[in-house]
Amino acid sequence: MKVKPSVKPICEKCKVIKRKGKVMVICENPKHKQKQG
């Protein structure tokens, strides 16, 4: 899980979602997981 000021999808399978008001990227590839904060 990477914590970044701006989250962007890296590949086609990356999905940008909102959980508890935080923007996150979830993906099949665990290296692509990102959280805004």
Swiss-Prot record:
What is any one of the record's Gene Ontology cellular component terms?
A: cytoplasm
Which SUPFAM superfamilies does its entry note? Answer: Ribosomal protein L36
Which UniProt key words apply to this protein? Ribonucleoprotein, Ribosomal protein
Looking at the Swiss-Prot or TrEMBL record, what is one Pfam family this protein matches?
A: Ribosomal_L36
Entry's InterPro entries? Ribosomal_bL36 (IPR000473), Ribosomal_bL36_sp (IPR035977)
One of the entry's Gene Ontology molecular-function terms is:
structural constituent of ribosome
GO BP terms: namely: translation
Query: Which regions span the lipid bilayer?
Result: none
Q: Does the keyword Cell membrane apply?
A: no
Q: Which PANTHER family match?
A: 50S RIBOSOMAL PROTEIN L36, CHLOROPLASTIC, LARGE RIBOSOMAL SUBUNIT PROTEIN BL36C
Family, according to the entry, reads as follows: Belongs to the bacterial ribosomal protein bL36 family.
Q: Which HAMAP family match?
A: Ribosomal_bL36
Protein's name according to its UniProt entry: Large ribosomal subunit protein bL36
Source organism of the structure: Moorella thermoacetica (strain ATCC 39073 / JCM 9320)
